[in-house]
UniProtKB/Swiss-Prot annotation:
Residues 66-137 form the HTH CENPB-type domain. GO terms for cellular component: nucleus. This is Tigger transposable element-derived protein 6. It comes from the Eukaryota. SMART domains: CENPB. Residues 170-372 form the DDE-1 domain. Residues 30-50, 99-130 bind DNA. Its main location: nucleus. Pfam families: CENP-B_N, DDE_1, HTH_Tnp_Tc5. Belongs to the tigger transposable element derived protein family. PROSITE patterns: HTH_CENPB (PS51253), HTH_PSQ (PS50960). SUPFAM superfamilies: Homeodomain-like (SSF46689).
Amino acid sequence: MANKGNKKRRQFSLEEKMKVVGAVDSGKRKGDVAKEFGITPSTLSTFLKDRTKFEEKVREASVGPQRKRMRSALYDDIDKAVFAWFQEIHAKNILVTGSVIRKKALNLANMLGYDNFQASVGWLNRFRDRHGIALKAVCREDSDRLMNGLGIDKINEWHAGEIIKLIADYSPDDIFNADETGVFFQLLPQHTLAAKGDHCRGGKKAKQRLTALFCCNASGTEKMRPLIVGRSASPHCLKNIHSLPCDYRANQWAWMTRDLFNEWLMQVDARMKRAERRILLLIDNCSAHNMLPHLERIQVGYLPSNCTAVLQPLNLGIIHTMKVLYQSHLLKQILLKLNSSEDQEEVDIKQAIDMIAAAWWSVKPSTVVKCWQKAGIVPMEFAECDTESAASEPDIAIEKLWHTVAIATCVPNEVNFQDFVTADDDLIISQDTDIIQDMVAGENTSEAGSEDEGEVSLPEQPKVTITEAISSVQKLRQFLSTCVDIPDAIFGQLNGIDEYLMKRVTQTLIDSKITDFLQTK
């Protein structure tokens, strides 16, 4: 007698299972769906019970849609980390070979703390099978192209094609570029040579660095509020500080992370929604800029890989000008200290934030427009302001300032002002830590450093009352009245500050009088 139990069991791929679930969701009767797909009612019930698991696999794209078994890898967290990295590389249209994937797997395994993991050919084959990845051989020509960058032909092709389509529906006022830079905020002129070329992945210098995100539009009419990332979430110098000229966040590396960038993006998107605007945001494809959230008012355009040095406006002089202005602020502070009896103190985070923000807002619209034109992203006719050279910012006065401070602080003769400005250009601003952060269960690797970690210990500043602030403005006004050729704009700004303070103090007095009146009733 034939054994009826020998009927071959059918296996369904993830894609087929989702189709079954989708059929039930569409309103079809379960019995009809079971007949349509040739499955038993119990199998259908199992599919429906496991739908959350299927949806999670689809959302994470951690299993190829044609794969029928969903057994996890032996080193599941390594597998997920490598696949997350692969998705980022694939999104950048970068070709990778099996050997590259194996090397990356070993690197990520080491970051996750695995010493015995072996990225063998067998592991690679199983990894490819799990995720439905088809690797193609990379010919010598492709390899050379990847190693040498896209080349001038690819850049010209981007200028003539993709960027024209991207900017077609936007005016220069609504085309933005965002980018990050590292800042050694406590760098002194005499330490320039020691800092230059330091990537600062960790160690003592990591406590002396910040990462700053800047964003501006192509017309030079709008610069967004900077985002500064430090190591300490609650530095002592920010105690009782409720208003800053920038947004401040923290993690243990003082790097830009995916979560921080996405938070910033969502805030900008909400602001554009309130203003009923739509903007184009051009960014590079570093690891912190991948896996973006849903945006309603921002269209994101990625600059071609390996070309940001010639295509990213902020990299073509805008950030450099900001650093020139920041370092000039720092030099003035040093000179004032040298000219007084006060001890030379290192800059704290609050002072650095104030100087970075002041430098950013001081970058001229003409400098911004010049750099956008240099990138070739907007036509020349869009520029309606004086496009003076961006290199004109470090003028004679700043060079004299540098020379004076350099002599007083014994700076080596071979170090010049440009060395001082560019000493932190090689700082890392993001890394694969986003991937590792997602993999490590129960350990938040983006956690900010402890309070005051690495911070300069300065005396706590006394809280200034509003009456003292008003008195200070009056003293400043008195001082300016004794000077010659003070621009009208200075008096206008002073009047604005005075008006704001008087409005606050009068409102406080009015509120207190009303409270007193109500309490007597």
